[in-house]
């Protein structure tokens, strides 16, 4: 399998997974034009679309793509049924696409129906986890999002996190505002800044590395706990997550 990315809008990535024959699955096509261009350039043969949630920048291109490739199956949670999904999926489902088995995880938080698609090593996580951050809570609760992130955090170390936005630099600046002396975060900041100066993407990321630099995955880390304790004593990791998320919302 080969992983490809298509830039869209200001900071979205549309992921395309292809096999050796050029058959492909398209993840969260927020707009059709760049996808159609890439399909023509690479002579890909689309078989399916994966939708993680209902927001327009993830589903806006579905109906136009179906006009060009009506044979495609569009997988998505119930909240995407009116956005073009033809095959509804839910937590624990498994589907077979391009000869590979994908497992579905419900990851409520950003939206209530958000799902992720996993076929080792690829995780298509939409707007649940970003490098150095996580999605805003538009519909779900901090507790729901925390549990969703813990599902992702339990995956194998070499999982490739394929998130949908280039938010890494801003996220790492936030992380440094909380833990300014953290060596892993500082090293990652230098790397990410260099990539972005060259207009290169920072994704995908490896889960093992993400655990070191993403504060939202470090809610039981003693350095972070000590920093939070300077402002408030929070005994539960979920409460520390909620504190972090509120800080990020106003950063």
Swiss-Prot record:
Record bears the keyword Transport: no
UniProt keyword list: Hydrolase, Metal-binding, Zinc
Residue sites binding Zn(2+) 1 per the record: 53, 55, 110, 127
The record's free-text note on cofactor binding: Binds 2 Zn(2+) ions per subunit.
Enzyme Commission number(s) from the entry: 3.1.2.6
Record-level Gene Ontology MF annotations: hydroxyacylglutathione hydrolase activity; metal ion binding
GO BP of this protein: methylglyoxal catabolic process to D-lactate via S-lactoyl-glutathione
Cofactor: Zn(2+)
Residues that coordinate or bind Zn(2+) 2: 57-58, 127, 165
Catalytic activity: an S-(2-hydroxyacyl)glutathione + H2O = a 2-hydroxy carboxylate + glutathione + H(+)
Pfam families: HAGH_C (PF16123), Lactamase_B (PF00753)
InterPro entries: Clx_II_MBL, Glyoxalase_II_hydrolase, HAGH_C, Hydroxyacylglutathione_Hdrlase, Metallo-B-lactamas, RibonucZ/Hydroxyglut_hydro
Keyword Hydrolase attributed: yes
Pathway in which this enzyme or protein is active: Secondary metabolite metabolism; methylglyoxal degradation; (R)-lactate from methylglyoxal: step 2/2
EC category: hydrolase
Matching SUPFAM superfamilies: Metallo-hydrolase/oxidoreductase
Top-rank taxon, per record: Bacteria
Homology family: Belongs to the metallo-beta-lactamase superfamily. Glyoxalase II family.
Function: Thiolesterase that catalyzes the hydrolysis of S-D-lactoyl-glutathione to form glutathione and D-lactic acid.
Quaternary structure and partners: Monomer.
PANTHER family in alphabetical order: HYDROXYACYLGLUTATHIONE HYDROLASE, HYDROXYACYLGLUTATHIONE HYDROLASE GLOB
Protein name as it appears in the record: Hydroxyacylglutathione hydrolase
Gene behind this protein: gloB
